[in-house]
Curated annotation (Swiss-Prot):
The keyword Transmembrane applies. Belongs to the PsaM family. It comes from Prochlorococcus marinus subsp. pastoris (strain CCMP1986 / NIES-2087 / MED4). The lineage of its organism: Bacteria, Bacillati, Cyanobacteriota, Cyanophyceae, Synechococcales. One of its GO terms (cellular component) is photosystem I. It is found in: Cellular thylakoid membrane. The gene is psaM. This is Photosystem I reaction center subunit XII. Its main location: membrane. Coiled coil: none annotated. Keywords: Membrane, Photosynthesis, Photosystem I, Thylakoid, Transmembrane, Transmembrane helix. InterPro entries: PSI_PsaM. The chain crosses the membrane at residues 9-29. It is a single-pass membrane protein.
Length: 34
């Protein structure tokens, strides 16, 4: 069960990175438009 836990942590990390990237892109677009 240890490998599954590590995989879950990796997936959660990727999701967090994806959300951070989307937020950064949104902020960049909003700043560029203004």
């Amino acid at each position: 069960m240890e490998p599954s836990q590590s995989i879950n942590l990796i997936i959660l990390g990727l999701i967090v990175v994806m959300h951070a990237g989307v937020l950064a892109l949104r902020l960049g677009i909003s700043l560029a438009r203004t």
